[in-house]
Regions:
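Adenine-nucleotide cofactor-binding loop residues
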Residues: 20, 38
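Activation segment
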Residues: 32-33, 41-43
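Helix-rich C-terminal or lid/interface subdomains of diverse kinases
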Residues: 39-42, 50-119
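Activation-loop N-terminal segment of eukaryotic-like protein kinases
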Residues: 26-28
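Pre-DFG segment of protein kinase catalytic domains
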Residues: 14, 33-36
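Hydrophobic residue at the +6 position relative to the catalytic HRD Asp in the kinase catalytic loop
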Residues: 22-24
């Protein structure tokens, strides 16, 4: 799976950079707060689409994608970011945070399943 090229809407913008389940507070089934702005930066905003694979099941991911209105190229870049960031977890946390590694392995599986479904 190649990293998709940039396209419309890929101009550098502010992004959170770490929209994972541990950084999202939900109350009453709705997003109440976002935590941990240590990764805040200016760059490819599609990095924040990782939330689709981090916390959503396939059906919810489809709803999210339609609600956000993201184009195909941006969606593919977001998916590539999700894979890249999930894989980067293993060397650092394999021995110390097995639960985090397990959740990132689930992200890798989701990304690969989505990629296979769109082949």
């Amino acid at each position: 799976m190649a990293f998709p090229e940039t396209g419309p809407g890929s101009e550098p913008r502010w992004y959170h950079g770490d929209l994972i389940a541990e950084n999202l507070l939900v109350r009453g089934g709705r997003l109440a707060a976002v935590l941990d702005f240590g990764g805040l930066a200016v760059g490819d905003p599609t990095v924040d689409l990782i939330v689709a694979w981090e916390v959503l099941d396939p059906a919810s991911r489809d709803v999210f994608r339609r609600a956000v209105g993201v184009d195909e190229t941006s969606w593919l870049r977001g998916r590539a970011w999700a894979l890249s960031l999930a894989l980067g977890t293993f060397p650092y946390y394999w021995s110390t945070m097995p639960d985090r590694c397990a959740s990132r392995l689930a992200v890798v599986r989701s990304v690969l399943a989505d990629a296979a479904a769109t082949q």
